[in-house]
């Protein structure tokens, strides 16, 4: 019972970590490429949406 759960959580957290790094990279790219427009997309609501999407992709 513990082994499949361990495997699932290992893959889940590894994928989530990689996806978070990708999201941070995209965010930094946009901040460099379009600095004026980047501030419009950085709010609590958009951060929550981005984090939720990353976790949903990781679970799926």
Swiss-Prot record:
SUPFAM superfamilies: Family A G protein-coupled receptor-like (SSF81321)
Cytoplasmic side: 27-46
Binding site for ergotamine: 10, 15
Biological classification of the source: Eukaryota, Metazoa, Chordata, Craniata, Vertebrata
Keywords: Behavior, Cell membrane, G-protein coupled receptor, Lipoprotein, Membrane, Palmitate, Receptor, Synapse, Synaptosome, Transducer, Transmembrane, Transmembrane helix
Residue intervals annotated with topology Extracellular: 1-4
Function description: G-protein coupled receptor for 5-hydroxytryptamine (serotonin). Also functions as a receptor for various ergot alkaloid derivatives and psychoactive substances. Ligand binding causes a conformation change that triggers signaling via guanine nucleotide-binding proteins (G proteins) and modulates the activity of downstream effectors.
Transmembrane segments: 5-26, 47-60
UniProt subunit comment: Interacts (via C-terminus) with MPDZ.
Name of protein: 5-hydroxytryptamine receptor 2B
One GO term describing the cellular component: synapse
InterPro entries documented for this protein: GPCR_Rhodpsn (IPR000276), GPCR_Rhodpsn_7TM (IPR017452)
Family: Belongs to the G-protein coupled receptor 1 family.
Annotated localization: Cell membrane; Synapse, Synaptosome
Top-level division of the source organism's lineage: Eukaryota
PANTHER family in alphabetical order: 5-HYDROXYTRYPTAMINE RECEPTOR (PTHR24247), 5-HYDROXYTRYPTAMINE RECEPTOR 2B (PTHR24247:SF31)
Expressed in which tissues: Detected in aorta, renal artery, jugular vein, vena cava and femoral vein.
GO MF: G protein-coupled receptor activity
Membrane topology: Multi-pass membrane protein
Motif DRY motif, residue numbers: 27-29
Domain comment quoted from the record: Ligands are bound in a hydrophobic pocket formed by the transmembrane helices.
């Amino acid at each position: 019972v513990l082994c499949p759960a361990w495997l699932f959580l290992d893959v889940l957290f590894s994928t989530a970590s990689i996806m978070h790094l990708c999201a941070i990279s995209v965010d930094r790219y946009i901040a460099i490429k379009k600095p004026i427009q980047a501030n419009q997309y950085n709010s609590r609501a958009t951060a929550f949406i981005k984090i939720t999407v990353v976790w949903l992709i990781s679970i799926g």
